């Protein structure tokens, strides 16, 4: 047997529903998940991050403090993950940390993206080298800096002569189109995933998320509101494209609801679920009329979402990535362990056709624990 090649992946998405930490062995043809752990984000830290995502005065001090605090949180996730295994830290080659996105503005004249969670702090508090800051090289090369996971999807999920679409539904939803032949792999953000659904149930019922989509399923979707929301210019943009809370946030939702105050809250929640499903389905149906659709991320656990989506993509067999041997909950964490592995071996990790970068490149920087 070949010697294990252990990397850890750390991911916290726009939904901010926890830090996923995964331990992965890359010594085989396909990555092997050894262990996974989700570290809850403490309420005081979550509030600070949510405030930082909205433009305001005195951001620099808050940014600096939160950068260190998120770094410590990510380190806690790694240490808790390793407590679940018998693998010593000395055997871990590196941690791949996504960080926490607080701004993603790739379409400005000088585009930028900003993830916090100081990798120096993670390295010091875990004793393991950290590879981080994966997105900014792609932006420096004229790309969107996102999505980065399609290169990983291509390596792990592509199958000759089969059209496959990998759909990740986190706060934002993104798709990877794997044509199964010499055609170009494509990938982009379709729009909101769980971000608006989560925000609205938190505001109304003080619940972090709509479990299994039950609240949305108790309401009736409003066609006029859905049509209005789907008229957002982002949905008609051609890829490469990426988005985030900067476009689809509480303020945007309040604007959309201004003329719909007569609607019951559960009807609005049902319409928000439809917004996610319709924006995803519209893009998938444009990519190819039929194929296999594999879903991962938090949205894969939402039964109402999966049911509605199935109805909107009749040409597709819909399953989660677990059917391909990769647990739907941990796909993004594994992807960032993979990105760290690519950096360690000096291999490129972005797909210019996906991000719009001028060339493929080695992504991220290494922060030594020594």
UniProtKB/Swiss-Prot annotation:
This is Anhydro-N-acetylmuramic acid kinase. Belongs to the anhydro-N-acetylmuramic acid kinase family. It catalyses: 1,6-anhydro-N-acetyl-beta-muramate + ATP + H2O = N-acetyl-D-muramate 6-phosphate + ADP + H(+). GO terms for biological process: 1,6-anhydro-N-acetyl-beta-muramic acid catabolic process; amino sugar metabolic process; peptidoglycan turnover. InterPro entries: Anhydro_N_Ac-Mur_kinase, ATPase_NBD. Catalyzes the specific phosphorylation of 1,6-anhydro-N-acetylmuramic acid (anhMurNAc) with the simultaneous cleavage of the 1,6-anhydro ring, generating MurNAc-6-P. Is required for the utilization of anhMurNAc either imported from the medium or derived from its own cell wall murein, and thus plays a role in cell wall recycling. ATP binds at residues 13-20. CDD domains: ASKHA_NBD_ANMK. The keyword Disulfide bond does not apply. The gene is anmK. It is an enzyme of class 2 (transferase). Keywords: ATP-binding, Carbohydrate metabolism, Kinase, Nucleotide-binding, Transferase. It holds the Pfam family AnmK. It comes from Shewanella denitrificans (strain OS217 / ATCC BAA-1090 / DSM 15013). Its EC number is 2.7.1.170. The keyword Nucleotide-binding applies. It comes from the Bacteria. Pathway: Amino-sugar metabolism; 1,6-anhydro-N-acetylmuramate degradation; Cell wall biogenesis; peptidoglycan recycling. GO terms for molecular function: ATP binding; kinase activity; phosphotransferase activity, alcohol group as acceptor.
């Amino acid at each position: 047997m070949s010697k294990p090649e252990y990397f850890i992946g750390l991911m916290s998405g726009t939904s901010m529903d926890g830090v996923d930490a995964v331990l992965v062995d890359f010594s085989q043809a396909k990555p092997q998940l050894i262990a996974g752990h989700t570290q809850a984000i403490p309420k005081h830290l979550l509030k600070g991050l949510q405030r930082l995502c909205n433009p305001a005065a005195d951001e620099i001090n808050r940014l600096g403090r939160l950068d260190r605090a998120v770094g410590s949180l990510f380190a806690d996730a790694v240490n808790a993950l390793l407590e679940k295994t018998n693998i010593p830290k000395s055997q871990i080659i590196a941690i791949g940390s996504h960080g926490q996105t607080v701004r993603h503005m790739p379409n400005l004249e000088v585009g930028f993206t900003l993830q916090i969670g100081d990798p120096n702090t993670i390295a010091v508090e875990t004793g393991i080298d950290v590879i981080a800051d994966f997105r900014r090289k792609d932006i420096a090369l004229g790309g969107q800096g996102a999505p980065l996971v399609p290169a990983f999807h291509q390596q792990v999920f592509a199958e000759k002569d089969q059209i496959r679409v990998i759909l990740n539904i986190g706060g934002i939803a993104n798709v990877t189109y794997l044509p199964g032949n010499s055609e170009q792999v494509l990938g982009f953000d379709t729009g909101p995933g769980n971000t608006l659904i989560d925000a609205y149930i938190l505001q109304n019922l003080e619940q972090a998320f709509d479990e299994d989509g039950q609240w949305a399923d108790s309401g009736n979707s409003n066609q006029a509101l859905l049509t209005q929301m789907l008229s957002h210019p982002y949905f008609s943009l051609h890829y490469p494209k990426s988005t985030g809370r900067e476009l689809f946030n509480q303020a945007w939702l309040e604007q959309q609801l201004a003329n719909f105050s007569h609607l019951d809250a559960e009807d609005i929640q049902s319409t928000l679920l439809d917004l996610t499903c319709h924006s995803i389905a519209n893009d998938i149906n444009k990519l190819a009329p039929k194929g296999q659709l594999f879903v991962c991320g938090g949205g894969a656990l939402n039964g109402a979402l999966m049911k509605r989506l199935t109805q909107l993509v009749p040409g597709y067999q819909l399953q989660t990535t677990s059917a391909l041997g990769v647990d739907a909950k941990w796909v993004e964490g594994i992807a960032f362990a993979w990105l760290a592995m690519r950096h360690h071996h000096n291999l490129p990790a972005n797909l210019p056709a996906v991000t719009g970068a001028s060339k493929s490149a080695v992504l991220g920087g290494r922060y030594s624990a020594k």
